[in-house]
Curated annotation (Swiss-Prot):
Cofactor remark from the record: Binds 1 zinc ion per subunit.
Record's protein name: Mannose-6-phosphate isomerase
Organism listed in the record: Mus musculus (Mouse)
Cross-referenced InterPro entries: Man6P_Isoase-1 (IPR001250), Mannose-6-P_Isomerase (IPR016305), Pmannose_isomerase-type1_CS (IPR018050), PMI_typeI_C (IPR046456), PMI_typeI_cat (IPR046457), PMI_typeI_hel (IPR046458), RmlC-like_jellyroll (IPR014710), RmlC_Cupin_sf (IPR011051)
Principal EC category: isomerase
Pfam families: PMI_typeI_C (PF01238), PMI_typeI_cat (PF20511), PMI_typeI_hel (PF20512)
Pathway recorded for this protein: Nucleotide-sugar biosynthesis; GDP-alpha-D-mannose biosynthesis; alpha-D-mannose 1-phosphate from D-fructose 6-phosphate: step 1/2
MF (Gene Ontology): mannose-6-phosphate isomerase activity; zinc ion binding
Residues the record lists as Phosphoserine modifications: 102, 108
Length: 423
C-alpha cells in the first residue's frame, strides 16, 4: 500500500524568554487545544510554534503507517511530494518555515542578509551566520500586533531630533545637519544622510548611550508623573523598551524606524536588509528556511555593527507603505492569498463561515502545511480513503496535488492558514 501523502503533525514549541507566559500565549492555547496530553505551565513562556523541517524544530509525523519519525526524514525519502517545480528549484527540500509567534517582550532589532551577502557572511563567520540562505519573512497578525519596520520618512526623524535632544546628541551635529539638508532632495541623498546618522548612533560609545538614555528616561518619567502626555515622542514605548533592555542602543531605534500596529489579518513583509523588530502580540509568520540574523539592538547577543550599517536598505517610506495586502481569490470567496515578491513561500488565509458545512481545500502543485486557528473539522482525503479529525491548533501536511475536503463538525467559523510555495 502506498504511503499516506496527507497526515497530521506534532510541531515543536520554542520557549524563548520573550514569549507570552502560560495560557496568555496563543502558541500555548493552540498546543493545548490540539493535544489533550499537553501540559501548559502558567509560569513558562511559549514563544514560537515551528511547523516545518528545520533541524532545530523538525515536526513529528502523527501517523503510525509511516515509518519515518519526522517530516524532514519523510520528505528526504519522498521528494516528489514537494511538487516537481519546488523539488527542482529547492534541491528536494521544503523551502519555507511556518510559525506562530506569541510576543510579550521586544525581540531584537534585526535585518536579514540577501542571498549573496548570506553566502559571504557564512563563509567568513559560520559561528554567527549558520547557513548561506536569505531569510525574507512575513508576519500576519492574529491579535493586535506591534512591530518596528523599515526607516520612517526623513521629515519624521528630523522632528524627533528636535524633540529628543538626547537622540540628536548621539547622532552629532554634522550628521544631523546633513539629514536636515537632504529633506525634499533626491532619494539617494536622503538614503546617504540616513546611513550616516544611523551609523553614528550605532557606533556611539556605550557609556554615552547609557547616560543619554538615562536622561531621556528620567525626563519622560517626570513628565508622565506630572500628568503630561509624552506620546509625541513615544514615551510609553521608550519606557517599556528601557525596562526590558536597560541601557540598550536599540531603545533609540524607535525614532528611526516605522512603528506599525497590525490588526488581525493585516500583514507586513520583511525583505532582505530591512531593519525590523517585533514588539508585542500574536502572529502567523512564514519565512525562507534560514537562521541568518544581523542584530542592531534590544539584545544581549552579538551585534555586528559594521555589517549591519553597510547592508541596510536606507530607503525611507511611510508606515502604511510597509503593510502587505493580500489578494482575494477569484474562485473562492473565503480565500485570501498573501504572495510576497520572493519564490520561497506564499501564505493563504481561509475564513469560512459556520453556515458552510464542507469546504474544499484547493489542490496545489506544491507541498503545503495547514494550521487550524479556529474551528473543528474532519479532513477527508479521497486518495487514501482516510479521515483525519482536526481541532484548533491542529497541523496537517498536504503533499503536492492532493485534494482535501474539510467537513465542519462543530458549527463555528473556521480560520485556517496554509503555507505553500507557488512557483
Amino acid at each position: 500500500m502506498a504511503s499516506p501523502r496527507v497526515f497530521p503533525l506534532s510541531c515543536v514549541v520554542q520557549q524563548y524568554a520573550w514569549g507570552k507566559v502560560g495560557s496568555k500565549s496563543e502558541v500555548a492555547c493552540l498546543l493545548a487545544s490540539s493535544d489533550p496530553l499537553a501540559q501548559i505551565s502558567e509560569d513558562k513562556p511559549y514563544a514560537e510554534l515551528w511547523m516545518g523541517t528545520h533541524p532545530r524544530g523538525d515536526a513529528k509525523i502523527l501517523d503510525n503507517r509511516i515509518s519515518q519519525k519526522t517530516l524532514g526524514q519523510w520528505i528526504a525519502e519522498n521528494p516528489d511530494c514537494l511538487g516537481s517545480k519546488v523539488k527542482n528549484t529547492f534541491n528536494g527540500k521544503l523551502p519555507f518555515l511556518f510559525k506562530v509567534l506569541s510576543v510579550d517582550t521586544a525581540l531584537s532589532i534585526q535585518a536579514h542578509p540577501n542571498k549573496e551577502l548570506a553566502e559571504k557572511l557564512h563563509l567568513q563567520a559560520p559561528e554567527h551566520y549558520p547557513d548561506a540562505n536569505h531569510k525574507p519573512e512575513m508576519a500576519i497578525a492574529l491579535t493586535s500586533f506591534q512591530g518596528l519596520c523599515g526607516f520612517r520618512p526623513v521629515e519624521e526623524i528630523v522632528t524627533f531630533m528636535k524633540k529628543v535632544p538626547e537622540f540628536q546628541l548621539l547622532i552629532g551635529d554634522d550628521a544631523t545637519a546633513q539629514l536636515k539638508e537632504s529633506v525634499g532632495g533626491d532619494t539617494e541623498a536622503m538614503a546617504s544622510a540616513l546611513r550616516n546618522c544611523f551609523s553614528h548612533l550605532m557606533k556611539s560609545e556605550k557609556k554615552v548611550v547609557v547616560e543619554q538614555l538615562n536622561l531621556l528616561v528620567k525626563r519622560i518619567s517626570q513628565q508622565v508623573f506630572d500628568g503630561n502626555n509624552m506620546e509625541d515622542i513615544y514615551g510609553k514605548l521608550l519606557l517599556q523598551l528601557h525596562q526590558q533592555h536597560p541601557g540598550d542602543i536599540g531603545c533609540f531605534a524607535i525614532y528611526f524606524l516605522n512603528l506599525l500596529t497590525l490588526k488581525p489579518g493585516e500583514a507586513m513583509f520583511l525583505d532582505a536588509n530591512v531593519p525590523h523588530a517585533y514588539l508585542k502580540g500574536d502572529c502567523v509568520e512564514c519565512m525562507a528556511c534560514s537562521d541568518n540574523t544581523v542584530r542592531a539592538g534590544l539584545t544581549p547577543k552579538f551585534i555586528d555593527v559594521p555589517t549591519l550599517c553597510e547592508m541596510l536598505n536606507y530607503t525611507p517610506s511611510p508606515s502604511n507603505n510597509r503593510l502587505f495586502a493580500p489578494a482575494q481569490s477569484q474562485d473562492d470567496p473565503y480565500l485570501s492569498i498573501y504572495d510576497p515578491p520572493v519564490p520561497d513561500f506564499t501564505v493563504m488565509k481561509m475564513e469560512v463561515p459556520s453556515s458552510v458545512t464542507e469546504y474544499k481545500v484547493s489542490t496545489l502543485d506544491s507541498a503545503s502545511i495547514l494550521l487550524m486557528v479556529q474551528g473543528t473539522v474532519t479532513a477527508i482525503i479521497p486518495s487514501a480513503h482516510a479521515e483525519i479529525p482536526l481541532y484548533r491548533g491542529g497541523v496537517l501536511f498536504i503533499a503536492a496535488n492532493e485534494s482535501v475536503l474539510l467537513k465542519i463538525t462543530v458549527p463555528k467559523d473556521l480560520l485556517i492558514f496554509r503555507a505553500c510555495c507557488l512557483l
